[in-house]
């Protein structure tokens, strides 16, 4: 579901959000963004 990547992919403070984006793409979303260290799919 939409928030399935929040727990799986924690976001680092700086830099590489590739893990979040990859998780979101695998879940069928366009991309992943980080908000307060949490991965959100859009």
Swiss-Prot record:
PROSITE patterns of this UniProt entry?
ERGTX
**Tissue specificity statement from the Swiss-Prot or TrEMBL entry:** Expressed by the venom gland.
Q: Does the keyword Repressor apply?
A: no
The record's listing under Pfam families reads: Toxin_17
Q: According to its record, what is known about the domains?
A: The presence of a 'disulfide through disulfide knot' structurally defines this protein as a knottin. Has the CSalpha/beta fold, which comprises one or two short alpha helices connected to anti-parallel beta-sheets stabilized by three or four disulfide bonds.
GO CC, any one term: extracellular region
InterPro entries recorded: Ergtoxin (IPR012622), Scorpion_toxin-like_sf (IPR036574)
* Highest taxon in the source lineage: Eukaryota
Q: Where in the cell is it found?
A: Secreted
List the source organism.
Answer: Centruroides gracilis
Q: What does this protein do?
A: Blocks Kv11/ERG potassium channels.
Kindly state which keywords UniProt assigns to this record, in alphabetical order: Disulfide bond, Ion channel impairing toxin, Knottin, Neurotoxin, Potassium channel impairing toxin, Secreted, Toxin, Voltage-gated potassium channel impairing toxin
Family, according to the entry, reads as follows:
Belongs to the ergtoxin family. Gamma-KTx 3 subfamily.
Q: Which cysteines are joined by disulfide bonds?
A: 5-23, 11-34, 20-39, 24-41
GO molecular-function term, one example from the UniProt record? potassium channel inhibitor activity
Query: What is this protein identified as?
Result: Potassium channel toxin gamma-KTx 3.4
């Amino acid at each position: 579901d939409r928030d399935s990547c929040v727990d799986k992919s924690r976001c680092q403070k700086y830099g590489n959000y590739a893990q979040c984006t990859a998780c979101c793409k695998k879940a069928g979303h366009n991309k992943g963004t980080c908000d307060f260290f949490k991965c959100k799919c859009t």
